[in-house]
Amino acid sequence: MAAKIFCLLMLLGLSASAATATIFPQCSQAPIASLLPPYLSSAVSSVCENPILQPYRIQQAIAAGILPLSPLFLQQSSALLQQLPLVHLLAQNIRAQQLQQLVLANLAAYSQQQQFLPFNQLGSLNSASYLQQQQLPFSQLPAAYPQQFLPFNQLAALNSPAYLQQQQLLPFSQLAGVSPATFLTQPQLLPFYQHVAPNAGTLLQLQQLLPFNQLALTNPAVFYQQPIIGGALF
């Protein structure tokens, strides 16, 4: 009997508490700390808040801290973009100073490179002209060191006198390529071509016919009217 009376009292108490209770939805943002005393609300609100809302509160706090910094970040970015040319110029100045220090440290090697720089550029563009220009400096060197310049000029290494003779005839050969008539009328060129004549008689004959050859180049009609040439031909 006592057990029945106890159960009846329990049911009455539960019904009374259910009628007077305040219900908060699980996803509601109403703080539970509002039911606490004012001096405890600030300390306990973060603990008593719904755990589902805690990540959302953290995101709001992070966004609130970032948004005021956004204009400052944009200003700093624009300032950095404006300073990029200055940074590039500073890097160029540093590089130039490094090159100057390198030149001062090895001035002899730098001067040698500057002397050969035009020849190297010409060699990459026109190898034939480059090889022709390479012959000119080595013709002035002593013939006692032919093996050192073998890759540059094999003729100078094998036969130095013939190479030097060709270097002396180089201006006249260029004249022959530009103007054959002017080249043949040069009387001072005849001693250079003595090696072409097979014997002394032929050389003397060429020397005698040299004035007539010049006349044939300047005026062929008058050249064929010469009696000496006519007698020699007929």
UniProtKB/Swiss-Prot annotation:
It comes from the Eukaryota. Residues 1-21 form the signal peptide. GO terms for molecular function: nutrient reservoir activity. Keywords: Repeat, Seed storage protein, Signal, Storage protein. Zeins are major seed storage proteins. PANTHER family: ZEIN-ALPHA PMS2. Belongs to the zein family. The alpha zeins of 19 kDa and 22 kDa account for 70% of the total zein fraction. They are encoded by a large multigene family. This is Zein-alpha 19B1. It comes from Zea mays. The lineage of its organism: Eukaryota, Viridiplantae, Streptophyta, Embryophyta, Tracheophyta.
